[in-house]
Amino acid sequence: MLNLKKSFTLISIALISTTSFASSHDHGNDPINSDHALRAILQCMTKVDNTLVINGCNLHIANGTGYTHKKNNVSAANGVGNLILGYNTLKYGSQTPELDRRGSHNVILGDGHSYQSTGTLITGRNNTVTGQSAVIAGSGNQISGYGSAIMSGSNHTIEANHASIFGGTNNTIYADATWGSISGGETNRVYAQLASVIGGRHNSAFGIASSISGGQFNQTTTSAPYAVVVGGSDNKSGSPAAVVLGGRFNEANGEASTVAGGFKRSTTGIHDYRAGSNFFSNQ
């Protein structure tokens, strides 16, 4: 009951202070207008059991700097103006980190988070955000890029702008991989713009707008924009628009060439084609 009383006391002080400031600014510190403004605010608030309901009003939280993100290349972040749901403890589990919480204008849920920027949505636990306008969930994840998102999973890192990771663990999108994405899997890496990895483990997309779907230890190289690897193990697409479809230790090194399965098959010419040893064995 004591905590509830304290909460309502703090709310009342905040409302009175805010209303007094607005009234003095607009009405020359007229106490009558101040009282009317306060009554108008309180009309939006009702208590239902243990719930404070705000109906018909906006809840506006700001940090007092006068701007949301940056102005004249100076950050608006000053550690206040955040909406924090829950206890926001410094510690979750056995760890006792020193957390940087200089951020402002963020929505924060869960414990053990570090937030230094503005305009982010943070949930889960033990996540770190230094990039603006990010969304982060899961646990032990980090975002330093602008407008990027980690939607679930653990121990992911995004350095690029406008990149995304959905699920899995220990996946990384590096700084040059703007608009890159990883969907699930483990220890996958994206290095180039618009590149993507879907599932699998230890796959690396170096080619611009290249894609790897499943499998393990597969790679598209820096000289292979628009290349594709689908499944298999230790396969490599090393030329523009080249494709490897499954198998092991296959390489598509000719432009727009295809290797369809098999073991240690390779292409070198434009539009070349190779397949596994069980069919088209003489090609």
Residues covered by each model-derived region:
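Boundary of Sec targeting at the N-terminus
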Residues: 23-25
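N-terminal signal peptide c-region/cleavage motif recognized by signal peptidases
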Residues: 17-20
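Periodic small-residue-enriched repeat registers in elongated scaffold domains
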Residues: 29-283
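Terminal amphipathic alpha-helical/low-complexity segments used for targeting or macromolecular assembly
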Residues: 2, 14, 53-54
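Bacterial N-terminal signal peptides that target proteins for export
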Residues: 1-9
